[in-house]
């Protein structure tokens, strides 16, 4: 039986096949992405550099000698590679377990192509049944946002002791019945004090590389 870590490593290396020479790549955050960053270091001479979604990923990229770029200084971004906490058959995702959801969402929006790399434990039929939806909030709005999330049917829990790279707080929302992920994403985003929500339904993955016991399964959004 192939271990979960081995599956993560396999999809991390598989993602290299989608990278063109002399381009700048968006890179996400998480344990699967850590394997991708290791793989990326093997072709670092062939790429221009990387836009990173978190300080954690930036630190790893710097150690490996991979140049970092500011998204504001780029005209376009060809590709973004990141993992997910959950992904469904429609390529909609829950992300943000590592707390980097806002920057992840910005880079995903900016990129022409979004590739999600996961092991098959992350693939679900319905989002939100296995874990919470992370919501990044302005600290002073935590209570107000929590009340609004309860009105939407959720059970928000403050992620104690966690401050995002943007200086904000995280609410993990349990018990949310997700029948229309895109609509729910919009509703949560519209709550004053919400910075971003870890539902990636409006900007879905274009390609998913899923590590399974039988090999790598590839899903396309179209």
Swiss-Prot record:
Pathway: Carbohydrate degradation; pentose phosphate pathway; D-ribose 5-phosphate from D-ribulose 5-phosphate (non-oxidative stage): step 1/1. It is an enzyme of class 5 (isomerase). Pfam families: Rib_5-P_isom_A (PF06026). The keyword Cell cycle does not apply. InterPro entries: NagB/RpiA_transferase-like, Ribose5P_isomerase_typA_subgr, Ribose5P_isomerase_type_A. One of its GO terms (biological process) is pentose-phosphate shunt, non-oxidative branch. Catalyzes the reversible conversion of ribose-5-phosphate to ribulose 5-phosphate. This is Ribose-5-phosphate isomerase A. It comes from Blochmanniella floridana.
